[in-house]
Amino acid sequence: QHDVEQCHEGHQPFTDAAAALEQQLPGCIAIQCDVASRASCELAFHAVEQAMGKVDVLVCNAGIAQQKLFTDITPEEWQRMLDVNLSGAFHLCQLALPGMIRRKQGRILTVSSMWGQTGGSCEVHYSAAKAGLIGLTKALAKEEGPSGITVNCVAPGVIETDMMAAFTAEDKAALAEETPVGRLGTPEEVAKLLVFLAGEDAGYITGQVFGVNGGLVI
């Protein structure tokens, strides 16, 4: 039996998702949260603790993307990218850790990107933020290991999500052709790895970065 909490900046999409998931997994709740805001994270985390009592697993999956030449990125766009993709994980990890340390157990999972590993042209700010998540994961794993807490990172490749809404069918076909396995990934494939890393069988795995990219990054 697991309780599931989902946080999302826009309330309606995840309210709908939570309602659908509730039919399969009782105990799922949706909470609105802007991870770029410490105050919003604190309110959301308090709501989760009130509803569930404790947080055993934290998945830092919030993210935004933007394709733009580096010389055209505004300071505001740079800061927003870091606030959502990196600082959000910082806020939530700081809120989750005291309880995990007290209980001497916990799982923290961050979701980076293959561009956090290799860098992406025209996505320098995105790549920098996602690379920061990898650094956070590795350092935090060393710091929290003695407290029975594991910290791991999943770095997806080209996955069929809303972030690809602007891509044409031709763009997607070209990306699939570049991928050694010959297709794009699915959210379910990423989720199944996260579920494993959150479970008891992954207790000796920490500080690692797992690529889910069909062989694009080897």
Write out the residue ranges for each language-model feature:
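Active-site helix of classical SDR
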Residues: 93, 129, 137
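The beta1-alpha1 cofactor-binding region of Rossmann-like NAD(H)/NADP(H)-dependent oxidoreductases
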Residues: 33-43, 75, 188-189
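Alpha-helical segment proximal to the catalytic Tyr-Lys
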Residues: 98, 142-143, 203
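C-terminal helical subdomain
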Residues: 146, 153, 176-205, 212-214
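Residue(s) in the substrate-gating loop at a strand-loop-helix junction
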Residues: 113
